């Protein structure tokens, strides 16, 4: 004991105790590598946290040096840093939002959820390491696969570049998908069932055969790939109405369809007359109306007459335009000079024709019947259906079929029809997506079509009907990413290097003023006066270089009239098209980047636009023109999806580069034409027509020849002339040709031979390998968040346990009382603790268990002088059992060698249960028990649920061979547990013995007390070793226990305790054995004080006082007697038992009464109180308890329990251990020797149903049936806790 004296005497550092909100359990937190211990209530209660971490703490508690140290962690400000930091601190403590919440509020939530627990921090770090390793592994695998793909792609590209010329497109290999045998078998079965269904429909057979009754035979699931998981439908809700169409789409798979049909068959079988099955009044039009409700182009909208007329008019206009387009293409073929192959034919916008030309259109071009299903689930299904009918089709044929479909009235019934203005323009991107050439396809994608290089046609792979659902999902995915689903070679060339603008500017596009528009139109007029040359626009302080007009290779212009266009003027030059104007507008964008609206705004400045054009028309036309421009072989624009901007790709080219590339294109075009034309013999017919044609041939040929000769020379810089105020250009006519070259074949052969040299000079560079690779979008796996710790709390209700309430009142015993209870003066508010009950059940040896309660001991600061022997009374009431009187002599303390004079105290008339025959209580934790002062413990009987009492490492809680929990206490844990002032009580069996023959008399025991006062320098724990003079004589003290009812004074501060459960059996029918002190050594029990205070309430009071008087068996002189009291609460609805401890003349009381349940109810075992005075012998007293209390409701007590041991250490035959844990009520109990939760009524029923558990029941025993040591005349019944070993299913547990 000497080694732990410092732990026993140090005050319990739990903060202030006078306010009833003391903190108890400390919790370790790991903050930035520093391990700190903080009170658990501080972390869990926001009010306490913000009371501590507040502005007042910052200003009043912290010192200047501490504040300066903490201010180092605040942000630094460039100007007035001190004032800014002060404002920041005020905002921090006032709870202001710092964009993403207040850091203090965030920290409190993290503390409350346990994110700073060392174990949580360690496992989160380990989890992060594991995730990072997994990420590195996936990255290595990805780059390994990417490297192999790069090497294979590079070899293929180099091989194709070696075989083909630089101006020709690189052919791509389209690998046909490899089908596994299972997939081929599944597709064969699908095809067979499809043919079978078609045959049945043709024959009109609706009956099911025996093979088709099974749903799985005609609705099989694909073993190779599942359509729905392979292509997840991405839901990306944005502000765009097109994207919102896929937001709430419900996907039904094959299993859902099977389940739906199965339910339908069962419903039809069991309830044929169900209202849902009566479909006689339903029509197909009603169903379509309901399905398409709210959609654009629905049937409901078609019934509107105004909408119907408008749609018919739009369809007629579209049909006219499509017919005119075909007509104009035929005309353009006869005039090679006006439209060359350098410009695609479809890029020329259709122009309205005269009505006479419509009448001349042949009837064969008008297709009245499309031959396809005009209502499809998606645009992909429509294309695959066209390919299925045509077997193989070229791109122009597919575009024509889509145009015919789009002009049909039924096309608007498709729900996806409004997603694009012109579906014919999207045929090529859709086919490239279906062929797997786009980067936006999923990883598990298999191509549906392939492109035949030899025949330049598209071919269908497999059956589209088998993959309708997958096609629909792919179509919605393609709609979201169609802007980036370009052809791979176009992407590679455009992504190779996004050029840097030649001139940086801060200009923002806005509507031009009149002067700005006039200057631009003058420059535009000069630009198109020389369309075969590059030009530089100088507007708004920066230059914009544009290339020559495509298809115009010399100054000689055509005399043909320009095509009619709805947006352009009819009197413009023929080579001024909407594509050239949009290209010029894109080139004029500031820094070469801008939105489509900005391009439209720049286009409006052109003088070639019609005067009555609206912004909507310009926006529509520009959208289509930009799509065509970025699909060209040498695209000039590219769309940046991330920034939603159009980028002009030629912004770094100079005029010389533009003209050099333009000359190369002219030479290549002439060479292709020369190769296509057959050589004709020279004719001598000099008709005007032939001369004109020869002129047309020889003129360009000579110029091309000259350009070839000049191409070998270094290019001379051309300085563009900026016109000041040029006059309007006169109509340009071709110059007259002086001589006619009759040898046309030789003239054409030279460009054909030397064109390769020109191509080599001006060929575009090989796209770098890095540009062909898409940047890998790496997604870091989300770090799993740590799980918040769960702390078991009790609500306003008390602990779930068996409740026994003693009788609220007992008649006064007729025994004489030595002295009346003295009024107790008011004492300062002291600490308190709520202790729940514990139960130990026995099966073989029925024994009682001692329960203990904490009582505040004397403070070391007060030295009380007692002048002489006083006389006090010890009164104990409401102990519902009788005890046998025993008289024992005084015995000396084993640790004291000097003889001492002591007085004899006699306990008389103890009204209560049988005194325990064998006391089994643990000794000091972590201390080796001394002989004669404590009972040795074994590991199997030492059970403490320390999880909520002390933060223990996992190694300290183990399980023994019997499956019971064992807690190993280290000296450090013991120091934490024992950090309080404690008092010691010696429990001996000498107080109790046979003596049963003395019926009707009160038991007498010897109470050894010291006769010396306690000095201020001596603490109660150091009393045995203190050297105190024994000058005062000792006297005999007779302690009488009599019933007494006394209300607690409200002015007194009181301890509010709930006692531990004391269970004893009925009297063993006179089999009382005598236990000597040699055979049964005493047990030392420690008690903790100072754990909370509540003001007392009026209730039943048990007053235990010690009266010193001179008795017959005086062993020495009388001295000062120090008395201490123990309070035993038996909480009722409105009554509380209170034990008042009077201390000599000062009469300082400590009362224990009813309390309220706390926020955290944790069991506390083995707590007993008394005071070890400075003297020869310690006080020895034994108090048995037999009360199970139910705590009353309340919220004013915060407990901080510390478990000191466990009862039932030496009980033999312990079959089932019901010990205290913090498991919630209602936990299922498991058979066997394992700890369980609180024994509630519900759990008791479960134990009884298992048939192998003992029963705890409440038995009301009349007072007359008890032993004769009870008060005479007491006929009322008292409550007793009885433990039986046999299950009694008939007797339900009562709760009072």
Swiss-Prot record:
Where composition is biased (Polar residues), the residues are: 741-758
Please note every region of biased composition (Low complexity).
Answer: 216-232, 700-713, 1016-1034
Q: Where is this region: Disordered?
A: 165-186, 204-232, 663-758, 1015-1036
User: Which residue ranges does the record assign to the DEUBAD domain?
Assistant: 39-156
Q: Which family does it belong to?
A: Belongs to the NFRKB family.
Instruction: List the InterPro entries hit by this protein, alphabetically.
Output: DEUBAD_dom, NFRKB, NFRKB_winged_dom, NFRKB_winged_sf
At which residues is the cross-link Glycyl lysine isopeptide (Lys-Gly) (interchain with G-Cter in SUMO1) found? 488
Q: Where is this region: Winged-helix like domain?
A: 370-495
User: Which UniProt keywords are given for this protein, alphabetically ordered?
Assistant: Acetylation, DNA damage, DNA recombination, DNA repair, DNA-binding, Isopeptide bond, Nucleus, Phosphoprotein, Transcription, Transcription regulation, Ubl conjugation
UniProt modified residues of type N6-acetyllysine: 1234
Principal localisation = nucleus
- Amino acid composition bias (Pro residues), ranges on this chain: 726-737
Source organism per UniProt: Mus musculus (Mouse)
List residues of cross-link (Glycyl lysine isopeptide (Lys-Gly) (interchain with G-Cter in SUMO2)). Answer: 327, 469, 488
PANTHER family from the entry? NFRKB-RELATED, NUCLEAR FACTOR RELATED TO KAPPA-B-BINDING PROTEIN
What's written under domain? NFRKB seems to be mostly disordered. The wing-helix like domain doesn't bind DNA.
Gene Ontology cellular component terms for the protein in this record: Ino80 complex; nucleoplasm; nucleus
Protein name as it appears in the record: Nuclear factor related to kappa-B-binding protein
């Amino acid at each position: 004991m000497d080694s732990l004296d410092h732990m026993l005497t140090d005050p319990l550092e739990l903060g202030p105790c006078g306010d009833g909100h003391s903190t108890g359990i400390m919790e370790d937190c790991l903050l930035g590598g520093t391990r700190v211990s903080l009170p658990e209530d501080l972390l869990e209660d926001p009010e306490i946290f913000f009371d501590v971490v507040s502005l007042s703490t910052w200003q009043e508690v912290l010192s200047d040096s501490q504040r300066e140290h903490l201010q180092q962690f605040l942000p630094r400000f460039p100007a007035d840093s001190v004032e800014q930091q002060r404002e920041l601190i005020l905002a921090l403590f006032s709870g202001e939002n710092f964009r993403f919440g207040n850091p203090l509020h965030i920290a409190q939530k993290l503390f409350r959820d346990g994110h700073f627990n060392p174990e949580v921090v360690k496992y989160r770090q380990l989890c992060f390491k594991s995730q990072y390793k997994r990420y590195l592994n996936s990255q290595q695998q990805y780059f390994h696969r990417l490297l192999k793909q790069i090497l294979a792609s590079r070899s293929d590209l180099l091989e194709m570049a070696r075989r083909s010329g630089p101006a020709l497109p690189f052919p791509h290999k389209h690998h046909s998908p490899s089908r596994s045998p299972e997939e081929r078998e599944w597709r064969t079965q699908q095809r067979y069932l499809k043919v079978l269904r078609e045959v049945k429909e043709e024959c009109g057979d609706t009956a099911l055969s025996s093979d088709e009754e099974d749903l799985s035979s005609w609705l099989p699931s694909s073993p190779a790939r599942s359509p729905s998981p392979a292509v997840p439908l991405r839901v990306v809700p944005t502000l765009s109405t097109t994207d919102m169409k896929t937001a709430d789409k419900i996907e039904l798979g094959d299993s859902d369809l099977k389940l739906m049909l199965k339910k339908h068959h069962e419903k039809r079988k069991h309830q044929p007359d169900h209202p849902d099955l009566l479909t006689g009044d339903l029509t197909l039009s009603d169903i379509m109306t309901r399905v398409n409700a709210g959609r654009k182009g629905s049937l409901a909208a078609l019934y509107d007459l105004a909408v119907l007329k408008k749609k018919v008019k739009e369809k007629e206009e579209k049909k006219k335009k499509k017919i005119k387009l075909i007509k104009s293409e035929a005309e353009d073929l006869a005039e090679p000079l006006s439209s060359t192959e350098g410009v695609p034919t479809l890029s020329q916008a259709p122009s309205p024709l005269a009505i006479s030309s419509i009448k001349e259109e042949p009837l064969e071009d008008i297709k009245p019947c499309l031959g396809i299903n005009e209502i499809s689930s998606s645009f992909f299904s429509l294309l695959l259906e066209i390919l299925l009918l045509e077997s193989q089709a070229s791109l122009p044929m597919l575009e024509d079929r889509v145009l015919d479909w789009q002009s049909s009235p039924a096309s608007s019934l498709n729900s996806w029809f409004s997603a694009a203005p012109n579906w014919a323009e999207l045929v090529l991107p859709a086919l490239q997506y279906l062929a797997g050439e786009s980067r936006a396809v999923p990883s598990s994608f298999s191509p549906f079509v392939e492109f035949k290089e030899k025949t330049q046609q598209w071919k269908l792979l497999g059956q589209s009907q088998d993959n309708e659902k997958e096609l629909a999902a792919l179509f919605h995915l393609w709609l979201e990413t169609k802007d980036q689903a370009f052809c791979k070679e176009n992407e590679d060339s455009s992504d190779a290097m996004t050029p840097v603008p030649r001139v940086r500017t801060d200009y923002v596009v806005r509507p031009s003023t009149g002067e700005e528009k006039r200057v631009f139109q003058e420059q535009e007029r000069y630009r198109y006066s020389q369309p075969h040359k590059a030009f530089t626009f100088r507007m708004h302080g920066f230059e914009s270089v544009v290339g020559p007009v495509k298809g115009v290779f010399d100054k000689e212009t055509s005399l043909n009239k320009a095509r009619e266009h709805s947006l352009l003027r009819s009197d413009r030059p023929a080579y001024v098209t909407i594509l050239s104007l949009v290209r010029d507008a894109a080139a004029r964008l500031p820094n070469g980047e801008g939105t489509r609206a900005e391009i439209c705004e720049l286009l409006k400045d052109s003088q070639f636009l019609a005067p009555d054009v609206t912004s909507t028309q310009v926006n529509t036309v520009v959208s289509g023109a930009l799509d065509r421009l970025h699909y060209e072989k040498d695209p000039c624009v590219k769309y940046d999806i991330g920034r939603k901007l159009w980028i002009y790709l030629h912004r770094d080219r100079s005029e010389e580069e533009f003209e050099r590339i333009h000359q190369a294109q002219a030479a290549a075009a002439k060479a292709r034409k020369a190769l296509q034309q057959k050589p004709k013999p020279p004719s001598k017919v000099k008709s005007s027509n032939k001369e004109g044609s020869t002129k047309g041939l020889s003129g360009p040929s000579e110029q091309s020849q000259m350009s070839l000769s000049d191409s070998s020379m270094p290019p001379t810089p051309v300085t563009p002339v900026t016109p000041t105020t040029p006059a309007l250009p006169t109509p340009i006519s071709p110059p007259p040709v002086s001589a006619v070259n009759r040898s046309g074949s030789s003239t054409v052969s030279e460009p054909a031979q030397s064109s390769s040299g020109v191509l080599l000079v001006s060929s575009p560079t090989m796209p770098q390998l890095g540009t062909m690779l898409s940047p890998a979008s790496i997604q870091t796996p989300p770090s799993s968040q740590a799980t918040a710790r769960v702390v078991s709390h009790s609500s306003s209700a008390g602990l779930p346990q068996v409740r026994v309430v003693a009788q609220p009142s007992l008649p006064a015993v007729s025994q004489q009382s030595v002295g009346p209870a003295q009024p107790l003066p008011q004492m300062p508010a002291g600490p308190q603790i709520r202790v729940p009950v514990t139960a130990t059940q026995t099966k073989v040896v029925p024994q009682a268990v001692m329960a203990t309660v904490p009582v505040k001991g004397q403070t070391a600061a007060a030295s009380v002088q007692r002048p002489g022997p006083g006389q006090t009374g010890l009164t104990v009431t409401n102990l519902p059992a009788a005890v046998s009187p025993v008289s024992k002599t005084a015995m000396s303390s084993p640790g004291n060698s000097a003889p001492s004079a002591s007085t004899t105290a006699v306990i008389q008339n103890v009204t209560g249960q049988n005194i325990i025959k064998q006391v089994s209580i643990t000794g000091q934790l972590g201390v080796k028990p001394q002989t004669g002062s404590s009972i040795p413990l074994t590991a199997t009987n030492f059970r403490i649920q320390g999880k909520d009492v002390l933060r223990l490492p996992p190694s300290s809680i183990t399980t023994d061979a019997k499956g019971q929990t064992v807690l190993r206490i280290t000296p450090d844990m013991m120091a934490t547990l024992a950090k309080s002032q404690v008092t010691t009580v010696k429990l001996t069996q000498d107080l109790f013995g046979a003596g049963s023959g003395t019926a009707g008399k009160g038991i007498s025991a010897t109470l050894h007390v010291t006769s010396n006062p306690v000095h201020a320098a001596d603490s109660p724990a150091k009393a045995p070793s203190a050297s105190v003079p024994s000058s005062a004589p000792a006297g005999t003290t007779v302690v009488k226990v009599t019933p007494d009812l006394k209300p607690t004074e409200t002015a007194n501060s009181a301890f509010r305790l709930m006692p531990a459960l004391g269970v004893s059996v009925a009297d063993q029918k006179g089999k009382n054995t005598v236990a000597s002190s040699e055979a049964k050594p005493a047990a030392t029990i420690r008690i903790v004080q100072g754990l909370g205070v509540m003001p007392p309430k009026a209730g039943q009071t048990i007053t235990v006082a010690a009266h010193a008087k001179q008795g017959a068996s005086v062993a020495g002189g009388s001295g000062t007697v120090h008395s201490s009291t123990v309070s035993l609460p038996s909480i009722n609805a409105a009554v509380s038992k209170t034990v008042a401890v009077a201390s000599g003349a000062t009469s300082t009381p400590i009362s224990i009464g009813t309390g309220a349940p706390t926020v955290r109810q944790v069991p506390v075992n083995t707590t007993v109180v008394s005071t070890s005075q400075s003297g020869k012998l310690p006080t020895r007293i034994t108090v048995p308890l037999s009360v199970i209390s139910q705590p009353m409701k309340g919220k004013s007590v915060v407990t901080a329990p510390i478990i000191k041991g466990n009862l039932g250490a030496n009980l033999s035959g312990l079959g089932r251990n019901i010990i205290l844990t913090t498991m919630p009520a209602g936990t299922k109990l498991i058979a066997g020797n394992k700890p369980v939760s609180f024994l509630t009524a519900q759990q008791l029923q479960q134990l009884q149903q298992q048939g192998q558990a003992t029963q705890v029941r409440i038995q009301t025993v009349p007072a007359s049936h008890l032993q004769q040591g009870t008060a005479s005349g007491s006929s009322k019944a008292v409550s007793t806790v009885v433990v039986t070993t046999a299950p009694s299913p008939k007797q339900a547990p009562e709760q009072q």
